Amino acid sequence: LHRRAPTEAEAGALSALDIALWDIAGKHFGVPVYQLLGGKVRDRCRVYYHVFGETRKELVDGVKDAKAQGFTAVGHLTPFLDEERDVPYFKTHAEKITEAIDAVRLYREAVGNEVDLCIEVHRRLTPAEAVQLGLGIEKYHPYFFEDPVTPDNFDEMAYVADKINIPIATGERYTSLWEFEMALSRNAVQYVRPDVCLVGGISGSKKIAALAEARHVGVVPHNPLSPVSTAACLQIAACIPNFALQEYPIGEDRAPKSDMVTGIAQHDGQGYLVLSDRPGIGVELKPNAAKKAPMKPREVTTRLHADGSVVDQ
């Protein structure tokens, strides 16, 4: 496991162990983990807030609501709308690209330049499509263009990065330091997105941040999971000089999540999470937390093209 890229299952298990060990060490010494990593270089961490919606209006309203709450960046923000799973997908190339460009225009007009837009494509484009869309939305100045193509071909991601003037963000599906090195060495990424729960925990994330720092590349930790994951991410964000933004899911500080965890990071109303000085990663599970969040089976589905083939997304 040390010298090869583990599967996501192995990587997730190893990452959980690493986070737990850092948490134990911090609590043993009575200090936050970021102190064990060299000390903090900032007092608070800027975040981007999730925006979801099934219609264009819902997405625009979500962007406006995030701004009203004080957030200065929004993400998980797609320029595409997904049809129902049982409806075969078909749009002409012109429809797909022009509608996506217009969506980004609406998001920008909704909040002006006071909020950064983190555009998420979820790997659904070919390199040629990604370049065309990227060129079309450049004038709206997105903070980054995330996973425009599948991340398994580093050369094609580099091709897209070279053809457009928007920073590329990628890495949420990588499980090893070496995958990040392959992307960085090709100038395929301007913001790396290590997932602390996949890349070897806090230890692995710190290594990736240092690798990116050598190339003046920013770090935007991937974080769609829970307040525990957020707490681990903040330990890294606190102490690395090239931290850029922290992904911040909706409802972190509200029930049901707040019913299960104490010490949850708080939004300061200005787009930042305030760093805690609590020992370890700063959070504790409440009694019976596991019983309040039992495992739920998740249906794996896929969308079909109008010709019956599977949508590669």
Please tell me what each predicted stretch does:
Residues 1-29, 312-313:
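Metal- or metallocofactor-binding catalytic centers and their adjacent structured scaffolds
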Residues 4, 135, 141-144, 150-279:
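Shared catalytic-loop signature of beta/alpha-barrel
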Residues 17, 30, 74, 120, ...:
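Conserved, mostly hydrophobic/aromatic
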Residues 26-27, 31-44, 265, 273:
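N-terminal amphipathic alpha-helix/helix-capping segment at the start of soluble metabolic enzymes
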Residues 28, 46, 50, 54-57, ...:
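Ligand-binding pocket scaffold of soluble enzyme catalytic domains
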Residues 32, 46, 116, 167, ...:
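Proline-centered loop/turn at the N-terminus of a beta-strand
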Residues 44-45, 50-163:
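Metal-dependent enolase-superfamily TIM-barrel catalytic cores that perform enediolate-based chemistry
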Residues 281-313:
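Extended hydrophobic packing segments that form well-structured cores
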